[in-house]
Amino acid sequence: MKINTWFGSLEVGSGGEILAFDLFPKGIRELALRSLSLRSSRENLPPEGFDLKAAALECGFVASLSEYYSLLHEVTLEAAKLQVSEAITPDQRIVQAVEALDDINETTNSLSERLFEWYGGYFPESGLVGEALALFIVKYGSRENVPPDDPLYLKARDSMGAKLETADEALLKGFAESVCSLYSRRKQLEAYIESSMEALAPNLTTIAGPMLGARLISIAGSLEKLAAFPSSTIQVIGANKALFKHLRARAPSPKHGVIYSHPFINTSPWWVRGKVARALAAKISLAARIDFYSATKDLSLMGELEEKVRKIRAANPKPPQKR
Amino acid sequence: MKINTWFGSLEVGSGGEILAFDLFPKGIRELALRSLSLRSSRENLPPEGFDLKAAALECGFVASLSEYYSLLHEVTLEAAKLQVSEAITPDQRIVQAVEALDDINETTNSLSERLFEWYGGYFPESGLVGEALALFIVKYGSRENVPPDDPLYLKARDSMGAKLETADEALLKGFAESVCSLYSRRKQLEAYIESSMEALAPNLTTIAGPMLGARLISIAGSLEKLAAFPSSTIQVIGANKALFKHLRARAPSPKHGVIYSHPFINTSPWWVRGKVARALAAKISLAARIDFYSATKDLSLMGELEEKVRKIRAANPKPPQKR
Amino acid sequence: MPDIKLLSEGIFEIMKDKRQLATLNLDPGKVVYGEKLISVEGAEYRTWDPRRSKLGAMVLKKFNIPLSKDSKVLYLGAASGTTVSHVSDIASEGAVYSVEFASRSMRDFIRLASRRKNIFPILADAGKPDSYAHIVEPVDLIFQDVAQPNQAEIAARNAARFLNKNGYLLLSIKARSIDTAASPKEIFKEEVKKLEQAFEPGFEILTARDLMPYHEDHLGVLAKLKE
Amino acid sequence: MPDIKLLSEGIFEIMKDKRQLATLNLDPGKVVYGEKLISVEGAEYRTWDPRRSKLGAMVLKKFNIPLSKDSKVLYLGAASGTTVSHVSDIASEGAVYSVEFASRSMRDFIRLASRRKNIFPILADAGKPDSYAHIVEPVDLIFQDVAQPNQAEIAARNAARFLNKNGYLLLSIKARSIDTAASPKEIFKEEVKKLEQAFEPGFEILTARDLMPYHEDHLGVLAKLKE
């Protein structure tokens, strides 16, 4: 019986005695690569309870147990490092970008609110929020610098806001610059996710849109896992809390998770949203599977979904009567 | 009897009849300023139940009730705006900076962690964190760009990290730039708080340090409120949760709030920290009062506190015996 | 078409999807704090969330609300104007003198006040009524929601100076702002006693009810001056 | 000088300020996950937090821990190595084959493994023992903490291939990872039954105790192969 080990191929007799062997060269990297290549082999496995280290000694692969362990330590370490270096697949890169985008969104909102509150003491009438406010502050600082041709000139001139001292103006401008930097980061991440999604999962991107598609992959963990989910799971991805409550306390089953943000659902009247969500989840599941297994674009998917949603809406023109 | 109203001074008889009057000019801003100047007058108040609008009609200040209300509306609005524009006092500006700094710290930490996690997939051996990591990524991007004269060259060359694609490198560099922007914002805010505190509250700054002093003002709401607190309150400022628990559920009284960060406390052995906190809080309270009421620097304060702390430590060289 | 019921002068209950408290919008088309606008036969109603307004909660707790379209009101503790806006809707031809101490809140309140002619903003300490005695006329109602430990005293001082003989006091007492440790029930008993006896002029309590479930540990009080 | 008590081979209880579980540090001066180092007469101990380690909790719940200094161990679910580091301390002259499926955890685990000669990292699915059959020798103990719904099956498969006739299985079962809805008690009963009967080879259960108060809804199990 032939068996494969990390240090070589052996021919073993029925009593476990070694009849012949073909040892690998002792290079760490080479041994690690061979070891990795053996991972998925279903044949020539050592029999249950086979003592690898005794065999390695017997064949003369190593001169001592301590050499055996020392070499195996280096080889397993190298193999693990090689695997780790290959772990960042295209869908994992999208997942990283989605997570980074979530962090950026959260911090941008929090710093934008602070800027609004802070600058509001100096020019509460500006009516500006978010990036527009940050850009305004970077440009002018104090409202005294707003020129007559700016649409906000009159409001700035007549503002009840306090006078902005030079030191505070520098502080606010710097703060606004950081906020602007975060807004451009947001755009950069969104653009990356859009183009990566189109390349990785064209069908999912068509059906769900790039951002929702990326979010689904991110919550599932990978495109492979998303493709493996039943569509009933996809329907409630991101509704963990509600789902947990449903399972534990027999609360009503949630109708939709993150797919709620899809325009087909949030533009539908409330009484058909559950049905639309079910149809959408089914199509997303199909799209993810095509993307994972064949990666070719199926041009008919979107038309089918639109038709299905149209039918659902047509069949349910009115809200159900309350009982 | 002479009485002051927002529209003029009146001479009123004992039956409430108007004997004479001196009306103000009808300019909105001028009336608003006069109205504000009457706020703190303790004399010549209208008697209880005095009907101002009837008097204004009677004196001919206005021709109709609707004119009365319309004018009063404009005047109260203008007065309130004037007050709001003066509300941002030097200590309020420090409070704003402290709040902005808190937000910046929180977001910087969260984005730094994300950067560490994300870049860790490409160069886990760098050993860099925080601003050093962000600066490294801005400088080099991929570890392939680390030159042989950089101390991290060997680690970069032999890293188990994945290969960093160009598109991801641009993303990571941009993200790192935003993080760097936040770190410089943090420094700018700290420098502002330090110099403002030295000017506003030199004694508090000497005793507590500028950052702790600013935080105490921020939690109290203003220097005036801080100066009005008893020192037992100052000792536990920022320990709200523990204090609330103490009041509600008879839990032990908290020994110190934010003043815990003071070097006199956190370098003291644990068994004298309560005593040191009490001494420190007393001196902080005194310093805040001097700053609020006289704003002159008292050079003896720090020496007295140091002496007091020295004595506390000398009197309690050993931990109390457990019973 | 939604079903509309009149609860008190200027205060409505509209049935649209669910029962909603509402007032007629004095500033048509404009929303103050994110509430909904509902148009019925040319009239525009603004919904009124009792969880965000002590007065709104008092309406639903069946307090008699002594407000009519020409009421003169002294409102103590205007904050950013959520409730004042509804009082302004109701007393559409009256006057709402609105006192608020925090300049940060006043900044927002000014935006509201500048759009409504019957609101008169006053940035002042409600505990010092002398400081606005040169502005405020005698009123029919004092509404007070100031979250100060000495709120009974504040009510008495303002009533002495500004409240008409037949006028009313509507008061919201927050247990926490009196004492964080004692039980709300004890606090309420104590505060009601203070209103009745501790200061000149004393009040006669007409109604006193907690504002559950809209506000926890809050007592609503309707009172008038002792004769 | 701290008081030291031997609880099991290589496992100590040190009294310093409070009782603390500890092992002798195989990598002196280095800390793995923020634990404390305590030096006593030239020997360096690493404290071991039972709240962060199922095995640590099992020690305190008085499980017999079948580990000695030359043990060969197959550790399934190495994560980032918190517990493996202590197993490596105890089996200082043995071998700890450490299987972990998540490459993110393996990234951190490699840092630990590279400093300790007796750790052999394996990035693989513990449910597929064939994939590391060419590496792992027969072992004296399988420790398993994988939080998979089919953990009984995983234990059986690995035991069949790698566990010595006289070897032991130490298993931590997390109720939530089997079923989020059922009661932990029911789940534990079911899982113990599966270990005994559902797969070849069956196990004989020696000890089964929950890991409270260190870990909620976790069952620790010590078992050996049926004869």
Curated annotation (Swiss-Prot), chains C, D:
Signal peptide region: none
Any one Pfam family match given in the protein's UniProt record, by short name: Fibrillarin
Keyword Protein biosynthesis: no
Top-level EC class as recorded in UniProt: transferase
Keyword annotations from UniProtKB, A to Z: Methyltransferase, RNA-binding, rRNA processing, Transferase, tRNA processing
Classification via InterPro entries: Fibrillarin, Fibrillarin_CS, SAM-dependent_MTases_sf
GO BP terms in the entry: box C/D sno(s)RNA 3'-end processing; rRNA methylation; tRNA processing
Binding positions (S-adenosyl-L-methionine): 82-83, 100-101, 125-126, 145-148
Top-level taxon of origin: Archaea
SUPFAM superfamilies for the chain: S-adenosyl-L-methionine-dependent methyltransferases (SSF53335)
Any one GO MF annotation of this record: rRNA methyltransferase activity
The keyword Transferase appears for this protein: yes
E.C. number(s) listed in UniProt: 2.1.1.-
Subunit structure: Interacts with nop5. Component of box C/D small ribonucleoprotein (sRNP) particles that contain rpl7ae, FlpA and nop5, plus a guide RNA.
Entries under NCBIfam families matching the protein: PRK04266.1-2, PRK04266.1-4
Alphabetical list of HAMAP family matching this protein: RNA_methyltransf_FlpA (MF_00351)
Function: Involved in pre-rRNA and tRNA processing. Utilizes the methyl donor S-adenosyl-L-methionine to catalyze the site-specific 2'-hydroxyl methylation of ribose moieties in rRNA and tRNA. Site specificity is provided by a guide RNA that base pairs with the substrate. Methylation occurs at a characteristic distance from the sequence involved in base pairing with the guide RNA.
UniProt family annotation: Belongs to the methyltransferase superfamily. Fibrillarin family.
Record-linked PANTHER family: FIBRILLARIN (PTHR10335:SF17), RRNA 2-O-METHYLTRANSFERASE FIBRILLARIN (PTHR10335)
The name this protein goes by in its record: Fibrillarin-like rRNA/tRNA 2'-O-methyltransferase
Provenance organism: Methanosarcina acetivorans (strain ATCC 35395 / DSM 2834 / JCM 12185 / C2A)
Highest classification ranks of the organism: Archaea, Methanobacteriati, Methanobacteriota, Stenosarchaea group, Methanomicrobia
